[in-house]
Swiss-Prot record:
Region (Disordered): 352-384, 405-430
Matching Pfam families: DNA_mis_repair, HATPase_c_3, MutL_C
Ranges that cross the membrane: none
Protein name, entry field: DNA mismatch repair protein MutL
An example Gene Ontology molecular-function term: ATP hydrolysis activity
Family: Belongs to the DNA mismatch repair MutL/HexB family.
Encoding gene (name): mutL
Organism, scientific name: Halalkalibacterium halodurans (strain ATCC BAA-125 / DSM 18197 / FERM 7344 / JCM 9153 / C-125) (Bacillus halodurans)
Amino acid sequence: MAKIIKLDDHLSNKIAAGEVVERPASVVKELVENALDANSRKITIEVEAGGLDRIRVIDDGDGIEREDVETAFFRHATSKIKTDKDLFQIATLGFRGEALPSIASVSHVQIKTSTGGDGGTEMVLEGGVIKKIGSTAMGKGTDLTVTQLFYNTPARLKYVKTVHTELGNISDVVNRLALAHPYVSFQLFHNGKNVLRTSGNGDQLQVIAAIYGRTVAKQMVPLSGETIDFTVSGFAAKPEVTRASRQYMSLLVNGRYIRNVALSKAIQQGFHTLLPIGRYPIAIVNIELDPQLIDVNVHPSKLEVRVSKEEELCRLVTETIERAFKKEQLIPEATKPTGGKQKSEQLSFTLDDFTSAKPSEDRGSTSSNEENEQRSSIDKNVLFQEERKLSNDLPSINMVREASASVEPALEKEPPAAELTAGAKGAMEQASMEEETSNSLPANRVPTMYPIGQMHGTYILAQNDQGLYIIDQHAAQERMKYEYFREKVGEVTNELQELIVPITVECTLQEAAYIEEHLEDLKQVGLFFEEFGPQTFMIRQHPTWFPKGLEEETIREMIDQLMEKRKVDIKKLREEVAILMSCKAAIKANRHLRHDEMYALLEALRKSSDPFTCPHGRPIIVQITTYEMEKMFKRVM
């Protein structure tokens, strides 16, 4: 008797369902993707009990012909590809022909569909077995309902999470699809309650507002970049808006949401030193490319893909984000609201909200969050009108300018303390050089600020006609020192420094294996490792550009890079070394500065290429606008 047999289709579908249908969110994803492939312009998703009791997807797409309805639930039956050639230029979200039979094999399914001709077709399946098929009256489109999910696979049902968790996963899937397809109107209901609604007018920013709230949408910066092979667009939130996890970064390739570690790192690299350690950005990155450059046939879920010329694409994503932020003024307001989205405003959100606001809206608000939101930096034109009305009651800013101007001659006669002068002077020279060589950087990203004092020997207080500024002096000079050392360390030569006392480095077994494997690569960058006992190496010489006193830290950074990327990136290494040097060299807290020292530091900061955060991503400047100050003292209501 033969031991090897061919599994029947029913069992094969249940096995395939283990990969395709992991949880209720997987069902929603597959059904909505089918609706999108059918050219739908309106998709409604209804779920009950987190999708465990019922999932219903209704669309106004092309529908399915009567003779194809039964075939659609056969394994590997599809209308989206026909030949081998089609597999290498896939333009649809689905193509494997596994979703419908896999879903049907572990649930009860009812489908009603019509192509808009003579009525429609209705079919009912239980565990993949057809129980009923016939005609029904309906308009063009498809209405598919899934109930009793995993009823015949108790092992899978046992690992399903709580209703709230499953609803969160479903919401995440629909959010990503809505972001990827702004021209499609999405509605998501849970237990009859509307959770998400998008207009389908093609405006991705409105979709962002519906998902993340208007406050976040107002902080979005548009992205735009392209090469011969790739086009990048989308939005990234300003660095003051961050999250504790990576899940708020959405990568959308040809309308498909994907996960890609290299591209996610490219997004983070675009923010570079603008993000605090342990925080992640909100970003929606749309990537358009030739379908031949991407392989989506990696996993049945189609979330993992392989991209040709991935390194070039990562570089484009990083440069696009960097370029977008170079044009922005990134000083956060001290009173900026941080609340979540306001559902009452989702449906009426328009782009006009980003450029204007009526004073009557502010007076009519009963919510402090709404009031703060409407008085945010988006509405500066309205606020400045009220500021001018009260200008006669406040000390003239000209007095401050005159007082500050009198300090300028002192700067020429009496240089600041040596510790500050070297960093400030070097940074100012570097910033000046960058301004001459790069016309793309907008002028006056940081306004002129006039120091009026210091708080606790740590924070510089400055003002101008726009309000009060609080500057972290350590973070400010750390930024200056970083830019100075980045250029200094950037002068890499092939010269080596012989050491009188060799450096010994102890490694783990894994690190030692990587070092031995890449000895030649390390020699190329001027680092010669000699074995010196078990898991220990000795270094007798190193490149002359290694910073004095930080040789061991630099070598350790090289080893860490080798472990992560299997190569040594000199450019990245220089940046890490510059950050380390700048942190050690910058002035510390409780250091009292003279007026001319504060002024010199603020002027150097204005000319910095990235004046808003220190190299670790912490903010340097916080602003309290004149209006907010007047509001605190009840001068305006």
